[in-house]
Amino acid sequence: MDAAAGIAALSLAEAARAGEAAVGGKAMGLARLVALGLPVPAAVVLPVGWRGGDSDLAAAVEGIRPPFAVRSSAVGEDSSGRSAAGQFETVSGVRTTADLGPAVTRCLASAGSARAESYVGETAPMAVVIQHQVAAGRSGVAFSLDPVTGRGDEVLVEAVFGHGEGIVGGGVDPDRYRVTDAGAVRVRRAVKPIALEPSGRRRKLPAERQAARTLRDDEAVAVARLVREAEAGFGGPVDVEFCFEAARLWLLQCRPVTAMGAP
């Protein structure tokens, strides 16, 4: 409990009950994934108005293994009317509880950044998600509704080696997999000269790996099936950020599909 403000850090299950106005869009999306029984890395939410110190942060993340990803969760982001993907702050690779305070401060401050205000038109109330950062060897984004064609009979899966910010930020051309509900897969491979590390550092890939497939067919199908489960639970088209930690598939974010445009 944050003694100064009387606002407790919340588990994702508690965040679902608290509601989006208290925990923001990103946290609410994760909470809904957990409620559906889908695989999400362990996380805790600092609700809007949380004002704790280092000891409060250490207590909040007890039981969550470092490293941590500290992620802003603004009220109104990732709603069906708009997505603020990439507009607010995420601090990756936080290795100790002593480093959590500055990371949380950066996320809270991003609510008033010029970039975010120009996107959403106002300073948004901000919560923060502190999540175990898995060692992602491959990452991506998947769409239950194709953002180019508008077709809903295939799941579009985009994937790169390394950390997924390369796709979200537009810095890496991903492999693209179109997966039918019957499990058929069509692949368009891309040359991927770099992989993004959690620190943000770009690592050059060996020449023989640059054109290699990021996902096997069965892995693309596994992603597509979880996306369909999320779509059913959310009640409409979604895009989902995911990663593979070795062979284990994790979902990192889920939001409604908000716009049509080239992937």
Where are these regions (language model features)?
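Extended active-site and interfacial segments that coordinate phosphate-rich ligands
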Residues: 27, 87-114, 139-199, 253-263
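Conserved catalytic alpha/beta cores of large enzymes that bind or transform nucleotide phosphates
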Residues: 159-239, 244-246
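Short beta-strand segments
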Residues: 71, 131, 158-160
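Short, ordered coil/turn segments that flank beta-strands lining enzyme active or ligand-binding pockets
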Residues: 84, 148, 245
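N-terminal beta-alpha lobe that positions the nucleotide/phosphoryl donor
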Residues: 1-129, 136-138, 210-235, 251, ...
